[in-house]
Amino acid sequence: MAKIAVIVGSVREGRVTEKLATWVAKEVANQADVETLDLRDYPLPFFDETIPPRYNPSRTLAPEVKKWLDKIAEFDGYVIVTPEYNRSVSGVLKNALDNLGNEIADKPVALVAHGSTGGAQAVASLRITLPGNGAVTLPNALFFTDQVGEAIDDAGILKAELQEGPYSAQASLVGLVGALTAYSDALATVRT
C-alpha cells in the first residue's frame, strides 16, 4: 500500500488549510497509508543556497532541514494542500519546496488549493515549481474558494450537500486520491 503525505501548506493561526487537509487525509486513509505533515512542525531557515539542492548532494544541512528532508523522503506520493497568497503559494511552502533535493523525484503530487479565485494561481505556481524537484504533478487538482472553511468542520467532515453526486467535492477527491495511488504504483517502477 502506498504511503502518502498530506502537506499543510500554511502556518497561519485559524487557517482554513488545516480543515481542508484533515478532510483530504480522511479520504487518503481509505486508499493508502497517510500521514499529515504540518509545516508548523518543520520550521526551516530561509533557503539561500547558491547551487540548487538537486545538483548539490554533498551540501551541508542545518538540523531543521535534515529533519524535513528525512521525513519527506519516506513517502511514495504527496497531496499538497495550499492557500493562495498573492496569486501564488505561501512563502513557508515555497521555502520548504526550495530546500528539497531529490526526495520527491519521480513521485506523484496531487494539488488541493483554496483562495479567492479557488486557488488556481497557487496550483499554477506549483505546477511550475515541482518539476524542478523532479516531482510528477497529477493533471487534475481540486479548487475551493475561501468559503470552504464553512463547508468543512474542524473534524474534517464535509457538509452533506457537497458529498452527494458524481461531480461533488467528495467524488472529485475520491478520484484524485485514486489517481495519486495509481501514479504512485506506476512510478515506483521508475524509482527502483
Where are these regions (language model features)?
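N-terminal beta-loop-helix "entrance" segment that forms/cooperates
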Residues: R40-S58, I152-D153
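A generic structural motif
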Residues: A29-E35, V136-T137
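Glycine-rich phosphate/pyrophosphate-binding loop and the adjoining helix
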Residues: L138-T192
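N-terminal beta1-alpha1 ligand-phosphate binding loop
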Residues: A2-Q31
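Residues at the starts of beta-strands that form the adenosine-phosphate
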Residues: K3, D33-E35, P108
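Helix-loop-strand module that forms the ligand-binding subsite of alpha/beta enzymes
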Residues: N56-V136
